[in-house]
């Protein structure tokens, strides 16, 4: 029989919210008897935006803003039906983007 696994990829702008959501998923999966690999921290994507400070003059005066996207990866190996049900019922924070892929 093939080993089935669930790959969960989480993204968020705030790393504290992301870590809390990751902790919830790991504890839920372990509580239902699944084997969890991770969380694996993936590289943080940094987008920088440079704008002029003044709308009229002084081209040399600029201001920079950045958006950091933090990412984590989880693998749940051999999930039980209870694991899948518990993960579906799990209520995560609003600022976390969750991608779930089922694989063999």
UniProtKB/Swiss-Prot annotation:
PROSITE patterns: RIBOSOMAL_S10 (PS00361). Signal peptide: none annotated. GO terms for molecular function: structural constituent of ribosome; tRNA binding. SMART domains: Ribosomal_S10. One of its GO terms (cellular component) is ribosome. The keyword Iron does not apply. Keywords: Ribonucleoprotein, Ribosomal protein. The keyword DNA repair does not apply. GO terms for biological process: translation. InterPro entries: Ribosomal_uS10 (IPR001848), Ribosomal_uS10_CS (IPR018268), Ribosomal_uS10_dom (IPR027486), Ribosomal_uS10_dom_sf (IPR036838). Involved in the binding of tRNA to the ribosomes. Part of the 30S ribosomal subunit. Belongs to the universal ribosomal protein uS10 family. This is Small ribosomal subunit protein uS10. The gene is rpsJ.
